[in-house]
Amino acid sequence: MKPYQRQFIEFALSKQVLKFGEFTLKSGRKSPYFFNAGLFNTGRDLALLGRFYAEALVDSGIEFDLLFGPAYKGIPIATTTAVALAEHHDLDLPYCFNRKEAKDHGEGGNLVGSALQGRVMLVDDVITAGTAIRESMEIIQANGATLAGVLISLDRQERGRGEISAIQEVERDYNCKVISIITLKDLIAYLEEKPEMAEHLAAVKAYREEFGV
């Protein structure tokens, strides 16, 4: 685990974005942890979040020309990541996001920001079923651009309804790399460093045993 990944876990815990306990997911599964990126909801939170996304992007080595944030949660992520790349990595890159509803006046269309072209890095909070990615792929392809990769905050590394995860399905279906700031493996490594969190560690390991990929 790299320093920025440990810092991200501590940041998420401090904002209660990451919680340990017992939570029922939309899938009906009982999970020993929950991650709600919507709680990164202040100016400082967003500034820090962008720095973590930018760090993960640079760390990945994936080459891309433009950031794309799918509506709605991806919009502030794309924006703050673009700012962080410019301020902290001297990479001044364009960004773009979509509207859920196309405009029929003003500039029109369903895209806001830079022209959607070249190699596109899609940024979002998490991938649950991969629906947002599939919708975004239609937009990217319709504009003649290509998907360079996908960056999310957390990879839960768990199976979907089949034997592979939603993330592995996206990688397979679109022949792209999905990267994350942290993974379930990183969470477990973090918990292993904290004796006071032994109870949560046991629960998370048991969950991984049952649903992990």
UniProtKB/Swiss-Prot annotation:
Inhibited by sulfate and phosphate ions. One of its GO terms (cellular component) is cytoplasm. 5-phospho-alpha-D-ribose 1-diphosphate binds at residues 26, 72-73, 99-100, 103, 105, 124-132. It is an enzyme of class 2 (transferase). InterPro entries: OPRT, Or_phspho_trans_dom, PRibTrfase_dom, PRTase-like. Its cofactor is Mg(2+). Gene3D superfamilies: 3.40.50.2020. Orotate binds at residues 34-35, 128, 156. The keyword Membrane does not apply. Keywords: Glycosyltransferase, Magnesium, Pyrimidine biosynthesis, Transferase. It catalyses: orotidine 5'-phosphate + diphosphate = orotate + 5-phospho-alpha-D-ribose 1-diphosphate. One of its GO terms (molecular function) is orotate phosphoribosyltransferase activity. Its EC number is 2.4.2.10. It comes from the Bacteria. Pathway: Pyrimidine metabolism; UMP biosynthesis via de novo pathway; UMP from orotate: step 1/2. One of its GO terms (biological process) is pyrimidine ribonucleoside biosynthetic process. PANTHER family: OROTATE PHOSPHORIBOSYLTRANSFERASE 1-RELATED (PTHR46683:SF1). Catalyzes the transfer of a ribosyl phosphate group from 5-phosphoribose 1-diphosphate to orotate, leading to the formation of orotidine monophosphate (OMP). Homodimer. Belongs to the purine/pyrimidine phosphoribosyltransferase family. PyrE subfamily. This is Orotate phosphoribosyltransferase. It comes from Escherichia coli (strain K12).
